[in-house]
């Protein structure tokens, strides 16, 4: 294998997940407002059906799903993506901006320790909301969102996880408060992204590093299409992907599997929010 082929294979491997963690929505409700999307009454039966549909889609794509029980009084614990950022057998722990979610932190810490995942960041003061604001497009490139939730300075400490480039992403729209609401890596040269959510400099960097990226429409962004999970040749997304985007992804060898996430969108989350990537 040539050097270029080896590099491409290493990059592509980032989208072949080994396993993920999910939290069943036993106590999922909308009890407070900490983002612009929150509101409405959750249909608990429907939420369970949607969660199970997402779990099945992930498993059918070949990725095992581990589960962690939800604790009563922590309705947003289902959005386990925000628990930390995992790299190999290490995790940089989250520190939530809003007090309503701070009770989740010791539960995640306990789970990581029980599962022999080395923890970094325990006791640190910098605000960081895990995989919601930080995602690898390949093993050597971390996209690092900051603004509404995570602090810019935290990424200096996240370097302790390993050797990789950190691409700072300046997020400028309150409705797209986490990076995973407006940016989703698809493969080694492309991502789904919503340009208005980013500064001009960040948009330029996305296209420089991921030149085949797909700019989604406002309607798609509001449907949380960028809150997607790519596993090999499957892009698992909330309902709302346009035909143009499906065609573009198809041309790149990807098929779209849409999953109804309407109950979770009442709390400002969807597919990617419900999953912690255990690389």
UniProtKB/Swiss-Prot annotation:
Pfam families: DDAH_eukar. It comes from Caenorhabditis elegans. SUPFAM superfamilies: Pentein. This is Uncharacterized protein ZK1307.1. It comes from the Eukaryota.
């Amino acid at each position: 294998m040539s050097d270029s082929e080896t590099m491409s294979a290493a990059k592509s491997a980032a989208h072949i997940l080994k396993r993920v963690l999910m939290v069943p929505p036993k106590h999922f409700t909308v009890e407070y407002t900490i983002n612009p999307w929150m509101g409405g009454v959750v249909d608990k039966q429907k939420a369970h059906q949607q969660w199970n549909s997402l779990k099945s889609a992930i498993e059918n794509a070949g990725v095992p799903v581990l589960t962690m029980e939800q604790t009563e009084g922590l309705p947003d614990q289902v959005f386990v993506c925000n628990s930390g950022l995992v790299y190999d057998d290490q995790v940089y722990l989250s520190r939530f901006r809003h007090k309503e979610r701070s009770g989740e932190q010791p539960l995640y810490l306990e789970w990581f320790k029980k599962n022999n995942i080395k923890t970094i960041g325990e006791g640190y003061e910098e605000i960081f909301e895990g995989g919601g604001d930080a995602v690898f497009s390949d093993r050597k490139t971390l996209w690092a969102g900051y603004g509404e939730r995570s602090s810019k300075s935290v990424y200096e400490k996240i370097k302790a996880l390993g050797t990789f480039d950190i691409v700072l992403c300046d997020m400028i729209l309150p409705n797209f408060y986490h990076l995973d609401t407006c940016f989703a890596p698809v493969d080694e040269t492309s991502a789904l992204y919503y340009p208005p959510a980013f500064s001009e400099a960040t948009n330029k960097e996305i296209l420089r590093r991921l030149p085949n990226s797909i700019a989604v429409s406002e309607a798609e962004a509001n449907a949380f299409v960028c809150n997607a999970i790519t596993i090999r040749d499957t892009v698992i997304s909330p309902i709302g992907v346009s035909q143009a985007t499906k065609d573009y992804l198809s041309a790149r060898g990807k098929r779209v599997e849409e999953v109804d996430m309407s109950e979770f969108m009442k709390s400002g989350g969807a597919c990617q929010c419900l999953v912690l990537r255990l690389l």
